[in-house]
Amino acid sequence: MINKSFFEIMLVLLASSTGFSRELKLVLSQQRRVNRESLKLLNKLQTSSIQQCLPHRKNFLLPQKSMNPHQYQKQQALAILHEMLQQIFSLFRAVISLDGWEESHMEEFLVELHQQLEYLEALMRLQAEQKSDTLCSENLTLQVKMYFQRIRDYLENQDYSSCAWTIVRVEINRCLFFVFQLTGKLSKQGMEP
């Protein structure tokens, strides 16, 4: 009797683990698709030529540790992805009617970012059962917040000029590419529990 119960419990655990893994892979696949769309839409929001704006370049000091997608635990990676997307969304939501940018492209871009955040929050809920290094995750998200604050300060110091936004758009392109790489890494890992 004990052996039969043990066998049934093991089958249930195995089935739920497989379902969990499939759901994660589906969410990650959707995340990568939406991220590709965000990159395309961001490139449509160009107002000034990049060459014209080169003298206005700035190094926003994206934390180098945050740029290496191969060194994270799952929870850390999810925390970084969430914070980056949340900051990008907040940055662009505040300027939905910037001169020279088509409002429809901006709205599409924001919708895509919002979708990414929803997919990511679903992933984070699925991973919430696992223990994580919250102190390290908090430190990394704080670094990302400081990075985006430097971007906001730059825009303010440049009076939100067209060139400043072009420089920021290029920088955000880097961020979205990083998000794409990190999501790909998580997909390859399978994010198995």
Curated annotation (Swiss-Prot):
Major localization class: secreted
Presence of keyword Zinc: no
Pfam families, per database record: Interferon
Keyword Secreted (UniProt): yes
Subcellular location: Secreted
Disulfide bonds: 53-163
UniProt GO molecular function: cytokine activity; type I interferon receptor binding
Keywords carried by this UniProt record: Antiviral defense, Cytokine, Disulfide bond, Glycoprotein, Secreted, Signal
Gene3D superfamilies in alphabetical order: 1.20.1250.10
CC per GO annotation: extracellular space
PROSITE patterns tied to this protein: INTERFERON_A_B_D
Signal peptide as annotated in the record: 1-21
GO biological process, one term: T cell activation involved in immune response
Glycosylation sites: 139
Record-linked InterPro entries: 4_helix_cytokine-like_core, Interferon_alpha/beta/delta
Function as written in the Swiss-Prot or TrEMBL entry: Type I interferon required for maintaining basal levels of IFN-regulated genes, including 2'-5'-oligoadenylate synthetase, IRF7 and ISG15, in the female reproductive tract. Directly mediates protection against viral and bacterial genital infections.
Family from the record: Belongs to the alpha/beta interferon family.
Protein name (record): Interferon epsilon
Species for this entry: Sus scrofa
